[in-house]
Amino acid sequence: MARGEGAEQFSSGLLPTAKSVTQNEIKMVKLPKQQERKRALTVWSKVCFAIGGAPYQITGTALGFFLQIFLLDVAQLNPLNASVILFVGRAWDAVTDPTVGFLVSRTPWTRHGRMMPWILVSTIPAVLCYFLIWVVPPIEQGKMMWYLLFYCLFQTLQTCFHVPYSALTMFISTEQRERDSATAYRMTVEVFGTVVGTAIQGQIVGMANTPCKNNTSPNNSSNDLIQSNNSHIPLKSNIFDERCAYMIASAVISLIYVVCAAVLFFGVREQDVQGELKAQKRVSFQKGLRLVMGHGPYVKLVLAFLFTSLAFMLLEGNFAVFIKYTLGFREDFQNILLVIMVSATVSIPMWQWFLCRFGKKTAVYIGITWAVPFMILVVSVNSSLIVSYIVSIAAGVSVGAAFLLPWSMLPDVVDDFKLQNPTSQGHEAIFYSFYVFFTKFASGVSLGVSTLALSFAGYETGVCVQSDSVNLTLKLLVSAAPVSLIALGLLIFMTYPIDEERREYNNKQLQLLLRNEEEEDEMEVLKPDITA
């Protein structure tokens, strides 16, 4: 679609007909100060909103980095069963997103808003299920069903939290600049949440390092006391210690989850933005879904970030195993993961400045491709702890961009949709839930396929050293596959039509519409006095 297309439809259908509206005239519009103050968000509101995003990232990081290795080395499941749990759990999680999005779109407005009740009700059951994911049940035959059940339950309840929270971006302010600022706050806290998740899970579990069996000497009677990185690990006692460590870490994360949800609920006021656009009318979910999925910029944005997200998910899901076995840093893998997340957190403000200065599309190209040389470097050089830390710092910068940019660009697509479909409203949850659906489905595919690939390569549970075929598979999973997916995603992104000029134009038209609606409301209030 050509730049600005759809503006004529918008202006002729909803704006006053007494004066024509051109792009140049719109640029001169100055909103009243009272209206600007109404839409302004305080720093406190932005911080509280941002804190609400931490639980999803804290739990997601812990699951993404550590669940695979927990199922394989602590719960002692075979790789095939672990791959089934990871794939089915993530696939189920993906299916729940459009379902919850539909239910949220049908939720009536309450005194707490439309999104907040979902966030409040889902919190406590979610943390209970999360804790039980990290418990090793005393039954051997039912282990797989135990993890599959509580993993799926947690993902469902987490969706009931995250989809309304994501859509809340459109209900905290009608001002695009305010939403972008709140999104930057949110991304900073969310990436900091990944640091917290990595630190809590990694450092607590790292105190009870995973025991392993000496697979090079199967007839050696000292297998229960093996040497790993110059330290002796008693096998049975350490398995028990590590199980306790995982439960302690999950309990701490569960407590943080509850605190963050409470801060969000009491610190953010959800605005009834839909009431401000009286000219709009609600359409059915099915029609809304067809409109959303038929909106070209949204489809292109989702497809592009689907492939780039899949690349980083492959890296995330396999990097701990890669560090532990291929690089041989059994006692350092949690610290290397922590460095990646700290680097990503520090880079978020820089990327926010960059996208404001050079535009969002440029930020995508630079930010996502930044990681590619380091993905290649980490599998090309000989195993070196110093090189691993350098690569981790550099890769974290790209991870920060991957966190910020999709959520910063989705509101632009929603605004563009509103201008091209001015009589349709209430589809924010559909936009966000289907984006999360596709990324979560990609995550399930990446974890399931990668764990299955390790099974075919001959991965052995609990051993100190894996075979060459396993190490080669891990190199492909953290380097060649992600690089190829990033290239494909960026090729699709080249067709994304919303540049900075179109984004600003859309924003000014929306503000003009809201201004006229508010003026009409004021006239309605004054009308009885005038006629009297």
From Swiss-Prot:
Domain of life, per lineage: Eukaryota
Effect of gene knockout: Morpholino knockdown of the gene results in early postnatal lethality and microcephaly.
Keywords: Cell membrane, Disulfide bond, Endoplasmic reticulum, Glycoprotein, Lipid transport, Membrane, Symport, Transmembrane, Transmembrane helix, Transport
Residues exposed to the Cytoplasmic side: 1-40, 103-114, 170-176, 267-297, 355-358, 421-430, 494-532
Disulfide-linked positions: C212-C464
GO molecular function: fatty acid transmembrane transporter activity; lysophospholipid:sodium symporter activity; symporter activity
Tissue: Expressed in the developing nervous system.
Main location: membrane
GO BP annotations, alphabetical order: carbohydrate transport; establishment of blood-brain barrier; fatty acid transport; lipid transport across blood-brain barrier; lysophospholipid translocation; lysophospholipid transport; maintenance of blood-brain barrier; transcytosis
Compartments where found: Cell membrane; Endoplasmic reticulum membrane
Glycosylation sites: N214, N220, N229
Family matches, as InterPro entries: MFS_2 (IPR039672), MFS_trans_sf (IPR036259)
Endoplasmic reticulum among keywords: yes
Family: Belongs to the major facilitator superfamily.
Physiological role: Sodium-dependent lysophosphatidylcholine (LPC) symporter, which plays an essential role for blood-brain barrier formation and function. Specifically expressed in endothelium of the blood-brain barrier of micro-vessels and transports LPC into the brain. Transport of LPC is essential because it constitutes the major mechanism by which docosahexaenoic acid (DHA), an omega-3 fatty acid that is essential for normal brain growth and cognitive function, enters the brain. Transports LPC carrying long-chain fatty acids such LPC oleate and LPC palmitate with a minimum acyl chain length of 14 carbons.
Protein name: Sodium-dependent lysophosphatidylcholine symporter 1-A
